[in-house]
Amino acid sequence: MCTRPGLAALLVLMTSCASSFSRADTQSASAAALSAASADAQAARQQQEQHLVAQQQQQQQQQQQHSNNNEPQQRAPSLDPYYRSLLDGSQGGQLFAPAQPVSQPDLSPDFSNPMGSSLSQSGTPEDSDTKVDTRGAAPKFFGKKRGQAPRFFGKKRAMAPKFFGKKSSEFPTSNSEQLALDTRGSPRFFGKKSFPESNREQRGSPRFFGKKRFDENVDIDERAAPRFFGKKSSGESAGDSGYISVASRGSPRFFGKKQDDDIMIAARGSPRFFGKKRSDDNVALDLRGSPRFFGKRQSSDLDDEISVALRGSPRFFGKKRADDEDILLGERGSPRFFGKKRANDENISFSLRGSPRFFGKKRSDESDDDNIGLVARGSPRFFGKKRSDETDDENIGLMARGSPRFFGRKRSDGLDDGGNIIDVATRGSPRFFGKKRSNSDSSDKSSDSALSSSESGRQTRQAPRFFGKRYVDEHHVSKRAAATAFPLIIEARQAPRFFGKREYRYPPRGSPHFIGKRFSLYRSPGKYSLSSPYMSAKEFKETFRRSDPFFMGKRTAELNEEGSDDFTNDDTDDENEYDETVLFKRGAPRFVGKRGAPRFLGRRGAPRFIGRRGAPRFVGKRGPPRFIGKRDLDWYQKALCAEADILELDDCADFLGNDDVKRQAPRFIGRKRGEDVSERDYAQLLEALSRLQAIKQIKARIQNEKRLWVPGMVGRRSEYNLGPFDEFVDESMER
């Protein structure tokens, strides 16, 4: 089989021979040559078409092999459209043999262009007549080009775009066209789809994640079940699918396994369900509203009714009750429960409802919990392990509710006289981080008095928020150090959040012991207080307006405290010597040492300047502006002298010596060559200057003699288009 360049050369040879035979002298010789050439041309055309078809098939096979191996294809050169039209007989149906062979440079430019058009690019020779110039173009093409489907990655499947998952392979052949229409529009389908008979409503089930139902009839309600995560109901009978109403359609955000029985309207609205749901027969309307359920629900045989209480238990995390008692209304409201709930068989009253935000393990002792009052509800934000002693908790009062934001381990010892009373004192220690007292020594005067009296309880509550060790640097206040040392600071002047082991002394001092400067006493608690590492001038002045903030010492006392010296023993203090009326006032701090003026290195005075302040210095001599090149002022001086004549000046030198004329910097940088301005241009320049002189003379004459104002021209007037103005000039000149 011949190659394509040899084939094209043969065709060109035949055409050139035909053109040489056409120039024969006699008509009989030309007719004989034409008949012989036409017969040979028909045979040659059939043979060449067969070669082209065989070669095209072979090239397609080679392209498929190369595309499978991901190798770039190099196009073979194609025929020129003119010679292809000769083969097709579109140029009159005559083909002439050449007299002389044609050399290679006389061929089509496609032979030298490997990216030119070819017959293998399109299907038929008719389509290949139109040459598509793709030289330098044809970008953005990846893979094998077949027809007109560019930018296609992967395996194409008829009408199912955007289908992710396992497609059904058991469709009957009769319904394949209908299913192609329905399957096309099912966007965002993730998982395994249903493959029995389905109608058009199955098309629109958006955002389906998981395994769908396998019943035969899928109605319009199941179509729209959005955001379904998990395994749906797999009832096999057609009657079960009939119960799927509009309610089952809208069950949004379902995570877990749904029940396999009759799905009523209640199952529709259970939003945000995480875990395993109940699998009993009748799910009432109350089951609908239990939102945010995380964990395993009860699987007992409570088939009668689940009351409204079960419906409203929001934000339940963990394992719910599995007992068979009646669930009262109080059970409903235990919101935000994290951990394991109580599993005893006592009646839980309305007070248990409100223990919000409980993190950890609740009490599971066998004590009598019948009378847990309303106060047990309110222990909010408890993080850690609660009390697990077996004391009598009948009288847990209202104060147990309010111990807010306790992080760590609570007291697990026996409380005062059997732990019957927990008063305000335990409640009020806010924002305590660390380990509380866990000793069971009830002989301590301070602890016994604190737990038994509400007055000392108020004092315990006022322990301020203190973080560890204060700063001991002496001079400047660093905001950046404050940002690192107080990461959770809210109000800097509150001495916030104590980390470590706190020593409980009753009554406590109003401020913890610290050595160092009074850091955050005069800081503004705004949101920009930690933005700069230095104090502003205003803050520096405010420190001196109130008191000197730079001190070293130990603060041990309250405000207006009498009868106490600097070196008292804290362990031997008696609580009776403190007056309760001044407990919440902050007194002047005690200082161990001598307070003096702040230290300054050197003398504070005017700012220093190195050198003499004076006029700005200039290096060299200030002179006229510099010009790069040679200034040619011949024509410029002529123009200025013309201006001097217009202004009726006697001497042109006086005009050139004027300061206004000198101040006009010439708009020329460089050297002006003489050959740039020809004689013709110079003559036109002189003519323009003369016209300008005449125009200005006319304006001056009209303005001076007739006292008339003629507006000047704004812009630039071309010297070649002064026809109408010349008539006006001539009329004025005649006057």
Curated annotation (Swiss-Prot):
A Gene Ontology term for the protein's cellular component: extracellular region
Principal subcellular localisation of the protein: secreted
Region (Disordered): 33-212, 229-251, 352-373, 381-400, 430-464
Composition bias type Basic residues, residue spans: 142-159
Biased composition (Polar residues): 66-76, 101-125
Modified residues (Methionine amide): 552
PTM-bearing positions, type Isoleucine amide: 515, 610, 628, 669
Secreted as UniProt keyword: yes
Signal sequence residues: 1-20
Modification type Valine amide: residues: 592, 619, 714
Keyword Chaperone: no
UniProt feature, compositional bias: Basic and acidic residues: 194-204, 438-447
Residues recorded as bearing Pyrrolidone carboxylic acid in the entry: 462, 494, 664
Modification type Phenylalanine amide: residues: 142, 153, 164, 190, 209, 229, 255, 274, 294, 317, 338, 359, 383, 407, 433, 467, 499
Cellular localisation: Secreted
Chain positions listed as propeptide in the UniProt record: 21-135, 168-184, 194-203, 214-229, 233-249, 259-267, 279-287, 298-311, 321-332, 342-353, 363-377, 387-401, 412-426, 437-461, 471-493, 503-509, 519-546, 556-585, 632-661, 674-705, 715-735
Leucine amide PTM positions: 601
Biological process per Gene Ontology, one example term: neuropeptide signaling pathway
Extent of Low complexity compositional bias: 33-65
Tissue expression from the record: Expressed in the CNS and peripheral tissues (the digestive tract, vasculature, and the reproductive organs).
Annotated keywords: Amidation, Cleavage on pair of basic residues, Neuropeptide, Pyrrolidone carboxylic acid, Secreted, Signal
Annotated function: Has some structural and functional features similar to vertebrate opioid peptides. AMRPs are inhibitory on Aplysia esophagus, penis retractor muscle, and body wall muscle.
Protein name, UniProt field: MIP-related peptides
